[in-house]
Amino acid sequence: MSVHYTLNLRVFWPLVTGLCTALVCLYHVLRGSGGARAEPADGVDGGFPLLKVAVLLLLSYVLLRCRHAVRQRFLPGSPRLEGHAAFSSRHFREPGLSILLESYYEHEVRLSPHVLGHSKAHVSRIVGELVRAGRARGSPGLIPGGALALAFRGDFIQVGSAYEQHKIRRPDSFDVLVPLRLPPLVALEPRSLGEEPALAPAFRGCFLCALKAPPSPSGASGGHWLRDCKPFADAFCVDVRGRRHLSATLVLRWFQSHLQRSLATVRYSLEGRCRVTLTPGGLEQPPTLHILPCRTDYGCCRLSMAVRLIPAVHLGDGVFLVAPPPPPLPSAPLLELPEGLRAEALWGVNTARQEQKLLSWLQERAAPGACYLKCLQLLKALRDLGARGLDSAAATQWGRILSSYVLKTVLLAVLLRKGAPGQGWDEEHLGRCLEELVQFLRDCLLRRHTLFHCVLGPGGAAAEVGPLPKALREAAPVDLLAAFDGHARELAAARLLSTWQRLPQLLRAYGGPRYLARCPPPRSQRTQGFLEGEP
C-alpha cells in the first residue's frame, strides 16, 4: 500500500541546528590545530568571536522560523493589528476540529515510515532465522520415531496493523503467524460451531478440528490408519464426542517448547546484532519475542520490539486456525460449554490474508487522496483517549469491546456499504468521515446495526477476497460484538459518544503544540467502571 512521506519538522530543525553546531566545532578544531601560527598583534581580532556571533544569530533565526512555520501550519490566519492595540489571544479564533485532528495526528498518531520500515526489517530477519532453525531442528523426542510430530513449515506470515499501514504511535509491537506442518498421515476436518445449539455467543465464531484419514489410493483400512496415527493423536488431540480433535492447548504447549529450543540454537549468532528473550504465553496471549537491536544503521531505529508469535494451522486458501479469542471479560467465570464439548479443542480462525486483499481492493477503487486509513488511525486514537480516567478493569473491558480488529471491521463495513471510498473521503472532510465511523460504531453497540465479520458475514466480501475453504463458506455469520452483554455495550456506547463530544477539548489537552491548549484540561473522570450516561 502506498506511503506518503512528509517533512518531519521535529527532526529537521534540530538536525539543522546540530549540523551548524558541528561546523562551528570543526572550525574551532581546525583553527586550533595551527599552534605554530603567531598570535595576532594587540588590538587585532582573530575573527573567531565574530564568527561565533554570526552563527548564534543564524541559529536564533532558524529557531524563530521553525516556531513561525509550526504556528502558520496549525493556526488559522490572525487579523492584522491596527494602531497600538494590545496583543491579546482574543485576536485568534480557536482552532477548529480539523486543525486539531491534523495536529494530533502529526504529533501523537502518525508513524515515521523510515522507523517503521527499519523495525519491520529487524523483525523479518530475526524471526526468519528463528523459524528456519526450528524447521531444521525438527521435533525430536516428543513422539517415538518423530515422523508423526508437528513441525515448523519454515516460513512466517506478517499480519496486523503494522503491515496494513494503519498502526499508530510507536512501531514496537508486531504480530507474526508461524504456520505448522502436519504429518503426511494426518488430515483435518474443520467444522464451525455457529449452529451449535445452546452455545454461548462468545463461542459462535470458534471451530472444531477433527482428525481424518487423508485420501489414499491404496484404499487402506480405517483401523490401520488409526493405529498408525495414534502417537500423534495421543500427543496433540483430545476426545470430543467420540472423535479425536486437534487441541489448541496441546499444540501451543509444544509450540512454546519448540520455540525455546530453536531460540537456544540461534541465540549465539544473534548476540552481535540484538538481545532476544522469549516470554511464554497462553491461549489469551501467545509467546512474545522481545528484540532489542544492539546496533543499527541509524540510532533512531534502536527500538525495543515485541513480536507475538502465533502458531497457525493452514486450512487452505490463506486461512489459518489459531487460538480462540479471549473471553469478553477477563474476570468473568469460564462460560459453560454444551455437553461433550471441551474448551481445549476450540480454535479461532485468522483471515488476515483475505482482509489484506480487501484493503488492496478498496485502495484500487478509492478516489485519489482518500484518507480512510487515516480515519482508522484517528478512530484508534479516539479509543485511547476514551480510556483515560478509567480504572484498570474498566479500561481492559473498553479495549476489548473496541479492539483494533473491531475498529478495522467498522471501517470495512462502512466502506463496503458504499462500494469504495468516494470523493467524500478526502482530507478536506476528515472530521465528517471520522464522525460517520463513530456513529456507525455507536449504532452497532446499541444493536441498531450488526457488526458482522468482514469475511464470515452474510454475503461478506467473498467476491473480493477470492476463494475460501469449505468450512468457512458453510459457517454461520459471526457477530463480533455478540460476546458482550447489553449493559456493557450501552455503557461503551455512552462513553464513545461522550468522548466524541469532548474531542476538541481532549485534543487540546493531550496532544499537539502547547499553544493549542487554550482551554483548561478536562475534569478528572477517574471512575470505577464506565460512565453511566452523558457527562
From Swiss-Prot:
Residues 39-43 are extracellular. This is Inositol 1,4,5-trisphosphate receptor-interacting protein-like 2. The keyword Ribonucleoprotein does not apply. InterPro entries: ITPRIP-like, Mab-21_HhH/H2TH-like, MAB21L/cGLR. It comes from the Eukaryota. Pfam families: Mab-21_C (PF20266). The gene is ITPRIPL2. It is a single-pass type I membrane protein. One of its GO terms (cellular component) is membrane. It is found in: Membrane. Belongs to the ITPRIP family. It comes from Homo sapiens. PANTHER family: CELL FATE DETERMINING PROTEIN MAB21-RELATED (PTHR10656), INOSITOL 1,4,5-TRISPHOSPHATE RECEPTOR-INTERACTING PROTEIN-LIKE 2 (PTHR10656:SF9). Residues 1-38 form the signal peptide. Residues 65-535 are cytoplasmic.
